[in-house]
Amino acid sequence: MSSAGNKGSDAEQCAAAFLQQQKLTLLEKNYRCRFGEIDLIMREDDTVVFVEVRMRSSDRFGGAAASITAAKQSRLIRTARHYLAGHEGDFPCRFDAVLISGNRENEIEWIRNAFDES
């Protein structure tokens, strides 16, 4: 039986592989700073893509998408700004979500521009 940490890591691995099949390039996994953590940082053409990966075994509490709250979005935005501040250049960026429904044979839903900085 997998622990919650292993399931999260498995979901991130699955999401990274899926996005790489979509021609995105993996830059970093589990980027951490004092503001929070970003599961995956990818690049699509010249755009830096910050990816939140969510796995839910049921939709009982709104499913994976509902778990990305306004507070979580705020932490992701601050963490992304920290990441960008450490890299030279002015890169366009966006925030995507990859939702994995464990109760449907790992059905993957990729939401581009899941939220913005406003």
Swiss-Prot record:
InterPro entries assigned to the protein according to its UniProt record, in alphabetical order: Restrct_endonuc-II-like (IPR011335), tRNA_endonuc-like_dom_sf (IPR011856), UPF0102_YraN-like (IPR003509)
CDD domains (alphabetical): PoNe_Nuclease
Single Gene Ontology MF annotation: nucleic acid binding
NCBIfam families according to UniProt: PRK12497.1-3, YraN family protein
Family per similarity comment: Belongs to the UPF0102 family.
Name this polypeptide is given: UPF0102 protein NE0719
UniProt organism field: Nitrosomonas europaea (strain ATCC 19718 / CIP 103999 / KCTC 2705 / NBRC 14298)
